[in-house]
Amino acid sequence: MSAWNKLKLLILISTTVSLAFAASNSSMPLISESGTTYQTKFAQLESSVNGRLGIMAINTANNQQLEYRGNELFPFCSTGKVMVVGAILKASESNPQLMLRQLHYSKQDTESSGYAPISGQHIKDGMSVSALSQAAIAYSDNGAMNQLLQLLGGPQAVTSYARSMGDDKFNFVRTEPQLNTAIPGDERDTTTPVAMALSLQKLSLGTALDKKQQTQLQEWLKANTTGDKRIRAGVPKGWIVGDKTGTGSYGTTNDVAVIWPPQAKPIVLVVYFTQNKKDAKPNDQVIAQATKIVIDEFTTASKK
């Protein structure tokens, strides 16, 4: 081999190694100032609570993303109500009168749903689609969600709506309260943290909904009454949070949120947590702690 050919070979090898290193380095987890990766922090948190933790966070200011078990399936429980109401709002774009439509239901409908703090008070007069949507998001009213599901055509219609947004993981099969069984390995009524975060971003901040409908969804999320001890408990004082919680068997504890830091673009965050024992207690603190890790990482990165 001539000297020139040897030189070209050396250059090729050097370039290949450099590119390989760059490619591997680009997917390496971010390192915090303490030298600990955020995945390590999540793993330590997960091991301390004897469960499985799934996280996806998107900083829309720079598209920085943090994920942990982001592509694993988790039971979504009542966080799925975001997708149901998203489908309702989408339908209202072409049918503005839809939100004013009055739906009537029975006492049996509310009682069988397992939780109907708002819809249960309106059995005689019924509720508008708008009021039912608000109840489903802000109060996690199962009776309200079941009425919205029936109006849409059932859980499969919501799954189809998710597919129309490019979400191929969201799998809605059952109604309330059956969808909250959260049995390990059961793929019914599950999604991944990554898929849910991307769908939530499209619904609340992107182009999946027209501006009027998107603003309404944001307002309902901000008015949520069930999340004070979860993601909201993990953000600094003065930050605005719009979220939807979910709780189920096996200690399943979920929260999905859009977070608005002061004078900064929003953060989309999904935190899912589930355990191995059917009668395990929900754990709000793990959601708050995971949120703090995310905020610390994003804050540190923005200062560099």
Would you name each region that the model predicts?
Residues 52, 146-200, 204-205:
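Mid-domain, small-residue-enriched loop/turn segments at the edges of structured enzyme/sensor domains
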Residues 110-147, 155:
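Conserved catalytic neighborhood of penicillin-recognizing serine enzymes
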Residues 10-20:
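Bacterial N-terminal signal peptides
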Residues 63, 75-105, 269:
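Active-site SXXK
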Residues 1-11:
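Bacterial N-terminal signal peptides that target proteins for export
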Residues 25-45, 150-151, 155, 198-229, ...:
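Structured C-terminal helix/loop/strand segments within mature extracytoplasmic catalytic/sensor domains
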Residues 90-110, 155, 159, 210-213:
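Short, well-structured active-site flanking segments
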Residues 23-75:
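Beta-lactamase-like hydrolase cores
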